[in-house]
From Swiss-Prot:
HAMAP family associated with the record: RNase_P_1 (MF_00754)
InterPro entries: RNase_P/MRP_Rpp29_sf, RNP1, Rof/RNase_P-like, Rpp29/RNP1
Gene: rnp1
Family (UniProt): Belongs to the eukaryotic/archaeal RNase P protein component 1 family.
Protein name: Ribonuclease P protein component 1
A Pfam family reported for this protein in Swiss-Prot or TrEMBL: RNase_P-MRP_p29
Length: 94
């Protein structure tokens, strides 16, 4: 499945450039970097000078694809990465 704005929430996020554009915690707004790790509840972004752990459920992320920037509500990403990206079986993400 190609990486498009419609399919982004079902893809592997590690390696994508990302920025926090909205969040319940104003301290994390504006954090940007490359996604280096993903867990069920967190995205880990590596910036120029440090590594940030941002909760998925309380933020909106802007992912930079090669052709455009895609906004994704973090609530859509809250799931085990393997479960969220699976292609077979009964899945809420399919």
């Amino acid at each position: 499945m190609p990486l498009t704005p419609e399919t982004l929430p079902r893809h592997e996020l590690v390696g994508l450039d990302c920025e926090v554009v909205a969040a319940s915690n104003p301290d994390v707004i504006g954090i940007s970097g490359t996604v280096v790790m993903e867990t069920t509840q967190m995205l880990t972004l590596e910036g120029a000078d440090r590594v940030w752990h941002v909760p998925k459920d309380s933020a909106t992320f802007a992912f930079d694809l090669s052709t455009e920037t895609v906004l994704v509500d973090g609530d859509r990403l809250v799931a085990r990465p393997a479960r969220r990206t699976e292609n077979t079986g009964d899945s809420l993400w399919r």
